[in-house]
Amino acid sequence: MAAALKPSAPEIRKAAQEFINYLNKAVTPFHATQEVKDRLLQAGFTELPESGHWDIQPTSKYFVTKNRSAILAFAVGGSYKPGSGFSIVVGHTDSPCLRVKPISHQKSDKFLQVGVSTYGGGIWRTWFDRDLSVAGLVIVKNGEKLQHKLIDVKKPVLFIPNLAIHLETDRTTFKPNTETELRPILETFAAAGINAPQKPESTGFADPRNITNNHHPQFLGLIAKEAGCQPEDIVDLDLYLYDTNKAAIVGMEDEFISGARLDNQVGTYTAISGLLESLTGESFKNDPQIRIAACFDNEEVGSDSAMGASSSFTEFVLRRLSAGGSTTAFEEAIGKSMLISADQAHATHPNYSAKHEENHRPAFHGGVVVKVNVNQRYATTSTTHAALKQVAFEAQVPLQVVVVRNDSPCGSTVGPILATKLGLQTVDVGCPQLAMHSIREFADTSSIYQATTLYSTFYERLSTVLSNMQ
């Protein structure tokens, strides 16, 4: 039972290590989505085209992607009929990071540099003095066709050095200018052969597909090599910087996870793992619900995109799953449904104890955290909290509760967005962590097992729990 397991238990260690194996590959939303897709295919899921016809059958398993950076997987219960409900767990694939600008070539004092944009609310000071690599999606032309290529350089190729303290006028604070001081070094003029003869620019029609003048040739050549093409074949790119220092299990008792992108690859991974685990028993054959795990992009910047939680993508999918019933089958299904928004939660920081509300202090190994905010920054209600408590009791997974101080700002999640857009009963939860939005975050090993077990039981038991609520 999850509640009785110590951090050293084999089940805890195994789940944490499997998550780390995933995390070290999921270096961008594109890579995370591909990793999830591979897991689903191995588990017997069928990919559905968003633009094609769907023929949904009971006890079958499917998934659909959006922009290659968001994915929605669903397993149709054996007793499902249009108008039955949805059991949904939602995470997101993105994290605060630096992303390469469309025109990235920069240089200063005999260094070639790469221009980057800040994505989300990162702790940007933590990106200094790190061995950075680059990964993402590259679109190349092949005759009249455009092909998508997923690339990961893996090797450290970029570096943002700190200014020596001897040159600082203010040695007590560090607030870098994110436009002028957050510019990664690529290489020196000397190494680049900057004085070598340059190819003359064409004076004819400028092919808009050719981006060779937008980036340093050395940088674009590196990307082209990874994509298996020539630099002039690259039409566009969507590249992310990341720390090459891999995630790991750390601590004297091996009880912690240290790594990048815990917010929110933990939510994405455990949502999918919970779904897959729920399908191994007999409950799926008799379940009237459709079990759904959704992983959206762009949560860190407000979710307002085609692949974000604010789009109509989720509604369109749910409506298609309700097709074939009465004209109000979709609306009927919403009333029989519940959604868990799985996004990381703040553990109580031992060095900043006063930042946390005195009676709501999530701890490592203390269980999945339920987020409550009366101003609707989180979507949890007493009804959804009670339903989750019943699920947690049956799963034997401990729960914690977090409320922010009245004099403190509060973050938010996709929970209120989807609750508002779809009218879904929603509960906001997350696994406790420290250093949220740093380039390297810190969590406990127990969370992966606890969250996976909770979500698996949620999928298996939700229809019964809801039917027993009066």
From Swiss-Prot:
Record-listed E.C. numbers: 3.4.11.21
Observed phenotype of the null mutant: Animals are viable. Suppresses the abnormal formation of intestinal vacuoles phenotype in mutants lacking the phospholipid-transporting ATPase tat-1 or its chaperone chat-1.
Key words of the record: Aminopeptidase, Cytoplasm, Hydrolase, Metal-binding, Metalloprotease, Protease, Zinc
Keyword hit for Cell membrane: no
Enzyme category, top tier: hydrolase
Residues reported in the UniProt entry to bind Zn(2+) 1: H92, D263, D343
GO terms for biological process, alphabetical: endosomal transport; proteolysis
Principal location: cytoplasm
Keyword set includes Methyltransferase: no
Pfam families: Peptidase_M18
Reaction catalysis annotation: Release of an N-terminal aspartate or glutamate from a peptide, with a preference for aspartate
GO CC annotations, alphabetized: cytosol
Binding locations of substrate: H166, E299, D343, H346, K371, Y378
Protein family according to the UniProt entry: Belongs to the peptidase M18 family.
Function field: Aminopeptidase with specificity towards an acidic amino acid at the N-terminus. Plays a role in membrane trafficking and is specifically involved in the recycling and degradation of endocytic cargo.
Protein name, per record: Aspartyl aminopeptidase
Organism for this UniProt entry: Caenorhabditis elegans
The organism's taxonomic lineage, starting at the top: Eukaryota, Metazoa, Ecdysozoa, Nematoda, Chromadorea
Gene this chain is encoded by: dnpp-1
